[in-house]
């Protein structure tokens, strides 16, 4: 069960408290684990920072940040969770959010392949992947700039700040 005392994120067109609550309810694992709400909030913080700096679609990035791990079945190896998240996102378009075909294609790609280690793609997809990878400190891994996609995420200041948030489990 989610600790309701957690601070809520800054809202936007996409990030509403109702949508965050929905994502939390859809997630079937413990939110105190490695892939729960606190992780999503750090990824959201990273994603917003990167999207602004890199000129990526904030709408797609915010959706990715909230949806990317909602379909996990376990905390360990779950190679299909990204594909399940992408399919799930398709079912929610027009219900919880509205994105056009181009935005949906970017979101689908970002969700489907976010755990596969790719570094090439549209800048919005790259921002999504880096937002998640910058939070690897939570599992004892310091992100390597060679495995990141964007210039902003590779900068020592951004990389170090994200790593400190992740190892100290600061929600955002």
Regions found by a protein language model. Name each.
Residues 1-14, 18, 28-56, 67, ...:
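Divalent metal-dependent phosphate-bond-processing catalytic cores, especially two-metal-ion Mg2+/Mn2+ enzymes
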Residues 33, 75, 79, 97:
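Short gly/ser-rich anion-binding loops that grip negatively charged ligand groups
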Residues 43-47, 80-96:
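An active-site-proximal "capping" alpha-helix that borders the catalytic cofactor pocket
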Residues 58-76, 81, 85, 108-115, ...:
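His-Asp-centered metal-binding catalytic motifs of divalent-metal-dependent phosphohydrolases/nucleases
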Residues 79, 83, 101, 105, ...:
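Short, amphipathic alpha-helical segments
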